Amino acid sequence: MSAKRVFEKFDKNKDGKLSLDEFREVALAFSPYFTQEDIVKFFEEIDVDGNGELNADEFTSCIEKMLKEVFVFCDVDGDGKIPASESYVTMTSLGKKFTEETSAEKVRAADVDGDGYLNFDEFMALVIGDI
């Protein structure tokens, strides 16, 4: 699932914009650890035009930025890859309720090139695909 598909899924009234309430659902789907304050602050930061709603472009850039920050944090050695063996820790730190076995299965499916690592695109597909 792409960031645009996530946008469409959570745009409940199909008006082409996400309200703060709709965005809250997205944020909590990514991680239940976000506080209300975190969500409001993040929403305000990515609402580039300041109209109190997120359009698809604002949302997509937000998701990519957020996931890039998580990816960089998890990419301890900075080589642009996260070992598949560490995905369980990464996913549970995002609040996902995976067993190690489930995590391994999801990583195998996301590891398109089969190298045993998740690059950013594979990581993004894994995280977004679980929403």
Swiss-Prot record:
Superkingdom, natural source: Eukaryota
Keyword presence, Transcription regulation: no
SUPFAM superfamilies (UniProt xref): EF-hand
Keywords: Calcium, Metal-binding, Repeat
Coiled-coil stretches: none
Binding-site list for Ca(2+) 1: 11, 13, 15, 17, 22
Pfam families: EF-hand_7 (PF13499)
Known function: Potential calcium sensor.
Source organism per UniProt: Arabidopsis thaliana (Mouse-ear cress)
Protein name in the entry: Probable calcium-binding protein CML34
GO MF terms, alphabetically ordered: calcium ion binding
Domain EF-hand: 1-33, 34-69, 70-97, 98-131
Residues engaged in binding Ca(2+) 3: 111, 113, 115, 117, 122
Binding site for Ca(2+) 2: 47, 49, 51, 53, 58
